[in-house]
């Protein structure tokens, strides 16, 4: 928790009443709202080979930004930069107008939640795995988060319920069940920024619908970035970024992009392979 000194100043960075605060490298404390911007970003995993070229985009709280494109187009790389897993070669990434380089990495990543296909679960109970999103969460908060994520139903059917032990990265659960727990973890954390990597086609249709509903529930009011694998799920995005060879070649809403009859139109009508 953030603690007050005798003079009333705040000393640590943590969640305050649902808001996230950062201590900058300058020592200044700021609250994160979730305005994320890329300004002419250039990036390569090795300096000799650039994989993202002049990427510019912005996302505000309450907006959903979807990235679509073939394998290797740069979708995952952009989300890795949102997390600052890597530093960029040129350009700037800002959060609420603050250069990402001025934000401590631990503070930044605590302000983000990721729901990815290959969910990482820990050895421990299901409750512990959900609580990882908020370490001081009560049992009631954990169950409420699971309900939001549509995970409570399958958890409650397990013999030990929320006390069920998970081993070996949750291998006793299906891939869909693991992802529902990851959504519950994000729901309990209530971060300002979410990164969602859609479920793969290997998940059964019923679980896929539960995952989509859970994701929709945790998106509200947050800045959301989606790595899209099926275009049917991004139609309601505020903006869709079509990537090809590390460049944004088209951007706009679903209807706007269909009207352009460009690459998105080709993807949507099955003329070009998305994966």
Give names to the regions the model predicted.
Residues 2-275:
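ABC-type nucleotide-binding domain
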């Amino acid at each position: 928790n953030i603690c007050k000194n005798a003079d009333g100043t705040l000393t640590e960075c943590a969640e305050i009443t649902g808001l996230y605060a950062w201590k900058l490298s300058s020592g200044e404390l700021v609250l994160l709202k979730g305005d994320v911007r890329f300004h002419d970003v250039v990036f390569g995993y090795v300096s000799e080979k650039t994989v993202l070229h002049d990427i510019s985009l912005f996302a505000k709280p309450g907006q959903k930004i979807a990235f679509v494109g073939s394998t290797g187009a740069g979708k995952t790389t952009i989300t890795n930069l949102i997390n600052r897993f890597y530093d960029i070669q040129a350009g700037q990434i800002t959060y609420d107008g603050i250069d990402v380089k001025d934000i401590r990495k631990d503070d930044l990543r605590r302000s983000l939640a990721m729901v990815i296909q290959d969910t990482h679960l820990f050895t421990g109970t299901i409750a512990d795995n959900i609580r990882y999103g908020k370490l001081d969460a009560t049992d009631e908060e954990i169950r409420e988060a699971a309900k939001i994520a549509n995970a409570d139903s399958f958890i409650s059917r397990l013999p030990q319920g929320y006390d069920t032990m998970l081993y070996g990265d949750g291998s006793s659960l299906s891939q869909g069940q693991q992802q529902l727990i990851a959504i519950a973890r994000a729901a309990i954390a209530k971060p300002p920024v979410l990164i969602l990597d859609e479920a793969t086609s290997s998940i059964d249709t019923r679980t896929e619908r539960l995952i989509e509903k859970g994701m929709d529930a945790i998106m509200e009011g947050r800045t959301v970035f989606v790595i899209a694998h099926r275009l049917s799920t991004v139609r309601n995005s505020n903006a869709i970024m079509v990537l090809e060879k590390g460049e944004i070649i088209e951007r706009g809403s679903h209807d706007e992009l269909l009207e352009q009859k460009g690459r998105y139109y080709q993807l949507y009508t099955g003329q070009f392979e998305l994966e």
